[in-house]
Amino acid sequence: MSLMSSSMVLCHCLSFSSQNPDPESSSSSLLRYKPCDSISLWGKRRKKLWRFVPSAEKNNSHTGNNNKRRRSWWQRFFFDDDGNWLGLRDDDIVDETTELAKDDEMSDEEKFETWKRRAEAIVELREGQEEIGDSGVVADVTKKWEDWIVDSDDSFVESWTRDSAGSDDNLELDELTIPDGGLVKMVRDMVLGAEEEDILYEDRIFRYASSKSAKFLAVLILIPWALDFLAHDYLLMPFLDRYVKTVPLAAQTLDVRRNQKLEMVKELNREKARYRLEVEIGKSPPLSDDDLWWEMRGKALELRDEWRLENRKAFANIWSDMVFGISLFVLLYANQGRVALLKFTGYKIINNISDTGKAFLIILITDIFLGYHSESGWETLLEIIMEHYGLEVEQSTITIFICLVPVIMDACVKLWLFKFLPRLSPRVSNIFQEMKRH
């Protein structure tokens, strides 16, 4: 059985070429040996049994790639017989070049999806090992070594491997298995770097996601802001200046409003009081009524022009902010992969925060926007928004808005805290239950 299997494997590695376009090399290449990377010899000291085992290829076997990558320099120094201690083999160089070429062909989204699937698989494997415990170590190692040994492309070698393995597999697995707990595991991880590979890989994923997310976030901020600035200052404002001069209806629409006139009156009264104070303290010469009237008239015209300019800017803000929103929507819609990457980064950042930190952030945000002292903050925010767009709203409307919207938001947040948060993070929910708000 062993001899028949060996002959089949050797025939599998030899390739006969009957046609050769080169006449000079046709005689020498009639029987040509094809290098077979999937054949390795393993020996047993106990039973003196030598057998051929097909190894998994790099691109098809994740476990084989990990085992090769985990071989440290001193293992190659003591156990490799070819003298190539740094691992610079021709096949490895060719394979690495092929992998680099494939990585260059893949887009950033495809690379991220591949790395994300591998990271999720690593996390699921760790969780499964923690749930199974020491009883599942042999089964896990058996599955890894079966995936590395068995070649699904060669049915003959696969059947021979299953028949010839027999009961010796358990002995080999017992020899290859290393205990997971205590000092032995720590020393093994330090020497072999078994867990360091996964940690470095996860760090590389998070570093890649963080850099890409930071760049995309900068694009989301800079490009819409630049378009907003260009549309406001170089398109809309010059157009409105000419349009107001030629169209009387537009000039009337963007003229000084009632509340602005009241502000102008207050400013003129303060200016008149300032002139009188300077005359009384001797800082300015006394002015006649006509001179004071001309001074107040010039100040009133200056204030009128300023308020008209503010009205045109507020009207231009509406359209420029629409440009900002449309450009932001286009960027988000055209970059779904980067949006998913940004969500992944945000999820990882939030997930890395401790439960106490999460509870602190929730308390801070809710108290700022929904606390008993947040009424003045909401009022100021609404006034800034109304002034930005040049809207004239009564104080009663702002009061009604503050009495309704923050209260509804507070009810929704409390419902989420007491109903859905215990499912997502029980420890954070326990912190909230221990707190007594007065």
Swiss-Prot record:
It is found in: Plastid, Chloroplast envelope; Plastid, Chloroplast membrane. It holds the Pfam family CemA. It is a multi-pass membrane protein. Keywords: Antiport, Chloroplast, Hydrogen ion transport, Ion transport, Membrane, Plastid, Potassium, Potassium transport, Transit peptide, Transmembrane, Transmembrane helix, Transport. Disruption phenotype: Pale-green phenotype in developing leaves with reduced chloroplast size, specifically under continuous light but not in the dark or in short-day, and associated with non-photochemical quenching (NPQ). The double mutant missing DLDG1 and FLAP1 (dldg1 flap1) has a pale-green phenotype similar to the dldlg1 simple mutant in continuous light, but a lighter pale-green aspect in fluctuating light and higher NPQ than in flap1 single mutant under short-day condition. GO terms for biological process: nonphotochemical quenching; potassium ion transmembrane transport; proton transmembrane transport; regulation of intracellular pH. Residues 1-54 form a transit peptide. The keyword Cytoplasm does not apply. GO terms for molecular function: potassium:proton antiporter activity. GO terms for cellular component: chloroplast envelope; chloroplast membrane. It catalyses: K(+)(in) + H(+)(out) = K(+)(out) + H(+)(in); Ca(2+)(in) + H(+)(out) = Ca(2+)(out) + H(+)(in). The keyword Iron does not apply. InterPro entries: CemA. The chain crosses the membrane at residues 216-236, 314-334, 359-379, 398-418. Belongs to the CemA family. Promotes K(+)/H(+) antiport activity supporting K(+) efflux to control H(+) homeostasis in chloroplasts. Also able to ensure Ca(2+)/H(+) antiport activity in vitro. Essential for chloroplast pH regulation and optimization of non-photochemical quenching (NPQ), a regulatory mechanism that dissipates excess light energy; acts downstream of PSBS but independently from PGR5 and FLAP1. This is Protein DAY-LENGTH-DEPENDENT DELAYED-GREENING 1, chloroplastic.
